[in-house]
């Protein structure tokens, strides 16, 4: 009976961890062909935000300048104007294909993320009993740890998330999430999120240490400040 109680929260925890990945992988395989066919046949208008439209226009201008320079080097611009127009046409078609693939992947990622969120939300509501068991199991596991191990875990987590080297990790994670939902890459927005989000987490952590840990385990706070200093 005790083994069954211990197995239930572990199974539920592994289910929560691996379920989003499995759902995302499955729906991507199922929806990719349908979204590709819908975009290439039924989509008559391209919906872009201002950042994406500006980025595509800049890339197209760079492409045109690159082809023009390449033809000038080959001395085709004066002697073979027809080849120059054909080269522009081919490169433009290739550029449009790349942009279409980008839009298809954006729609695919957004759809799978939305489906994962809905399924996990429904499972967390319907599996409330398992969530309570997981919560009680987590509390019991944490309470059985020594104060030194708890403080070490807190310091390790804070250094990973809000340490001096953490902005690089936050930049990669926020950038991938930002583009995964269909937003164009923007250095100003990304820099703003990277510079403010860790600060907010640091403030929340310090408030939690001051209010919760100081009330539950004052010795833990003393050890934390000693190791932190």
Swiss-Prot record:
Keywords assigned: Antiport, Chloroplast, Hydrogen ion transport, Ion transport, Membrane, Plastid, Plastid inner membrane, Potassium, Potassium transport, Transmembrane, Transmembrane helix, Transport
InterPro entries: CemA (IPR004282)
One GO CC annotation: chloroplast inner membrane
Pfam families named among the record's database cross-references: CemA (PF03040)
Disulfide bond entries: none
Reactions listed under catalytic activity: K(+)(in) + H(+)(out) = K(+)(out) + H(+)(in)
Record localization: Plastid, Chloroplast inner membrane
One of the GO BP terms on file: potassium ion transport
Membrane topology value: Multi-pass membrane protein
Membrane spanning stretches: 7-27, 114-134, 189-209
GO molecular function terms noted in the UniProt entry: antiporter activity; proton transmembrane transporter activity
PANTHER family from the UniProt entry: CHLOROPLAST ENVELOPE MEMBRANE PROTEIN, CHLOROPLAST ENVELOPE MEMBRANE PROTEIN-RELATED
Function (record text): Contributes to K(+)/H(+) antiport activity by supporting proton efflux to control proton extrusion and homeostasis in chloroplasts in a light-dependent manner to modulate photosynthesis. Prevents excessive induction of non-photochemical quenching (NPQ) under continuous-light conditions. Indirectly promotes efficient inorganic carbon uptake into chloroplasts.
Family: Belongs to the CemA family.
Protein's name in the database: Potassium/proton antiporter CemA
Organism, as annotated: Ipomoea purpurea (Common morning glory)
Gene that specifies this protein: cemA
């Amino acid at each position: 009976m005790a083994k069954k109680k211990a197995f239930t929260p572990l199974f539920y925890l592994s289910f929560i961890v691996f379920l989003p990945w499995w759902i995302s992988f499955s729906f991507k395989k199922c929806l990719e062909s349908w979204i590709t066919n819908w975009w290439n046949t039924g989509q008559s208008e391209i919906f872009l935000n201002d950042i994406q439209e500006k980025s595509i226009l800049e890339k197209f201008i760079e492409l045109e300048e690159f082809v023009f320079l390449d033809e000038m080097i080959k001395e085709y611009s004066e002697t073979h104007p027809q080849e120059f127009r054909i080269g522009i046409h081919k490169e433009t078609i290739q550029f449009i294909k790349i942009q279409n693939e980008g839009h298809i992947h954006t729609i695919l990622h957004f759809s799978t993320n939305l489906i994962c969120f809905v399924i996990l939300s429904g499972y967390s509501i319907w599996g409330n009993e398992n969530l309570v068991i997981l919560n009680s199991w987590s509390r019991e596991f944490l309470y059985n740890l020594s104060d030194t191990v708890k403080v070490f875990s807190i310091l390790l987590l804070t250094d990973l998330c809000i340490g001096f080297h953490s902005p690089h990790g936050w930049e990669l994670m926020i950038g991938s999430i930002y583009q995964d939902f269909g937003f164009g890459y923007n250095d100003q927005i990304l820099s703003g999120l990277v510079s403010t989000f860790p600060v907010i987490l640091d403030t929340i952590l310090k408030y939690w240490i001051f209010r919760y840990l100081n009330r539950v385990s004052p010795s833990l706070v003393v050890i934390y400040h000693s190791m932190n200093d």
